[in-house]
Regions:
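Flexible glycine/acidic-rich beta-alpha junction loops that bind and position SAM and/or redox cofactors
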Residues: 53, 105-110, 139-147, 163-176
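Hydrophobic, well-ordered secondary-structure elements that form the walls
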Residues: 43, 97, 135, 156, ...
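Acidic/polar loop patches that form or flank catalytic/metal-binding clefts of enzymes
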Residues: 39, 68, 134, 163-170
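Alpha-helix N-cap and loop-to-helix initiation/capping positions
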Residues: 16-24, 110-117, 144-148
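Conserved SAM/AdoMet-binding glycine-rich loop
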Residues: 26-132
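Catalytic cores of alpha/beta
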Residues: 82-84, 143-158
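Canonical Radical SAM [4Fe-4S] cluster-binding loop centered on the CxxxCxxC motif
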Residues: 1-21
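An active-site-proximal structural segment forming one wall of the substrate-binding cleft
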Residues: 32-33, 158-160
Length: 176
């Protein structure tokens, strides 16, 4: 994505992102499982693309590789309920993503490329598929008011109440 206003895209782990095909990833997974017996994998991409995760899920299912896995995403609209079901079938147990703030005004200023409603729909799709959702949240973004923060807390409370997210972590805004 590399567009969020607070993200330092010059950092090596962001600017030098190197993709691997689903086939290569599953080759590596099979090798690790064979060598270590490890069957739990955390993919630590900053925001794994939906197409890449779909390809990974399809390859895991095609090869009948049984693992548990989780990763980090942006709450993109292409994470449909159908894709969430496919990911769950392939062993996905959790997703983490940056909701950041529950304010469309602030999300726009942040250039997150998502809306509050979109986040609610995507997280609900994951949760309905049995995938746990963790939301990263922040406070103190420039121009964020006390009322923005209060509204965000209430919205996050509703996301928990409606089963859209199962965990969340608030941190103070700081530029990277």
């Amino acid at each position: 994505w590399k567009k969020c206003s607070f993200c330092d895209v010059s950092l090596d782990y962001i600017s030098r992102y190197e993709t691997a095909s689903a086939s290569t990833l599953v080759d590596r997974i099979e090798q690790i499982v064979a060598e270590t017996g490890q069957t739990g994998f955390h993919f630590v991409d900053e925001a794994a693309p939906p197409k890449a995760l779909k390809a990974l899920a399809e390859e895991l299912l095609r090869r009948k590789v049984h693992i548990s896995w989780w990763g980090n995403i942006r709450f993109e609209k292409t994470f449909t309920p159908e894709l969430a079901e496919l990911l769950a079938l392939s062993g996905c147990i959790a997703m983490s993503g940056g909701l950041e703030v529950a304010s469309d005004r602030l999300l726009s200023l942040m250039k997150k490329g998502v809306s509050v409603e979109q986040v609610a729909q995507v997280t609900k799709g994951f949760s309905d598929a049995g995938i746990l959702v963790h939301a990263y949240l922040m406070y103190g973004f420039p121009t964020q008011t006390l009322q923005d923060t209060v509204d965000a807390l209430e919205y996050v409370r509703q996301l928990f109440e409606n089963g859209c997210i199962q965990s969340g972590f608030f941190h103070r805004f700081a530029c990277t």
